[in-house]
Amino acid sequence: MKSASYMIGFSLLLFWLSGCNEKSNVVNISTLPKATGQVVMDTNYIQIQPAWKGIEFSNPKNIKIGYDYILYVTEPDNDRIIMVDLAGTVLGHSQYVKRPVAITEDRRFNLIIACEYDTTVGGTTVTVAAIAKIRLFNYDHNISAAPVEIVYHESPQEHITRDGSGNLITGREFTGVAVLADNDYYITRSGNNNTSPVDPDNMILHLDKNDNPYPGDYIQFVPSLDPTGTGYKSIVMLSGITTFNSRQYGTDFITTQTDPNKSYFKVVWFTYSQGSELSAPSWNSRFSLDPTNLPDILSNIFVTPQAVMVDDRSNIYVIDGSLDSLMKFDLNGKLLHESFGPSKSGNALLHPSGITYFNKIVYISDTGHNRILRYELSTDLK
């Protein structure tokens, strides 16, 4: 077992405005143009038919189109990954992987999965947060034949206990995973015990391509992080993370959080500053923090953002599971009119929890309806 020794923590002020009528920075998504029907303001999203359903999906959660141009779907309730081609045909299922909640693929065609793992301590079986890899290249992309290898997991002392509704009581859980250009990857971790100054439950771990944590960088990040905060650097109740396909943004990442005690800063793009003789290294928001001109993406617009992704132009897409909405932003955090909610999509989404993008098409894991939906801009229709 490798111990968790690298952390990216976050903290800041919270502005709780729910229940207030004056929300100067709030963007009302209900006023945006419809996503289906007539074309409004030049562009809107049109659903591609048919929806992918009836092909074995059961509460699909996270989805990812990998560098092999194949869609991967996590099914936590069925303890498996489903492999689907871009025509909607199921190509296979993984071997058993316990409660997979997030997935990505590196450039070596390794699937990297945030999941759980059962281990035995003193004759008692306990469950811990884990990272699994499926090395597709070594098995000719036959996902059914490729073994599920646990490459990293939490200590048994941090084992998971949940209540009857599945909510975490004690222990740590991994909630997201995102790969970098050099095949390193980040893991988002959440938990309720955050009193430790060096190893709180709320962290973002950084592992190299061979699944080793980065202890050397650990010291650099500590001064600017606060895993219990409520500001733009906080990482309470992390739900997802994404990185960028190019080296232009280096180690940058975007996180989503579902903390109900937080109205602002639920989706933040972080970039690393090396510091100077007068300032310590730190993670900072790439978006403007000017309170008089706060970008839409940092405003009081989200309830439970579940997943985030970026396209080739660095447009940012966020799925909100409570609002049943897709929100699209430009790289400066401005909400774009292609965004849509229930009234604009004909109630197409129900508790969506995953999103991915390929070749101008947006794929959404419509969890409540047990299906995958695809959307294309009206201007891109052939």
What spans do the regions from the language model cover?
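Blade-level signature of beta-propeller repeat domains, shared across WD40, Kelch, NHL, RCC1
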Residues: L349-K382
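Beta-strand-rich domains and repeat architectures in extracellular enzymes and scaffolds
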Residues: Q49-D79
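Short loop/turn segments that connect beta-strands within beta-propeller blades
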Residues: V84-T89, R135-H141, D208-N212, T271-S276, ...
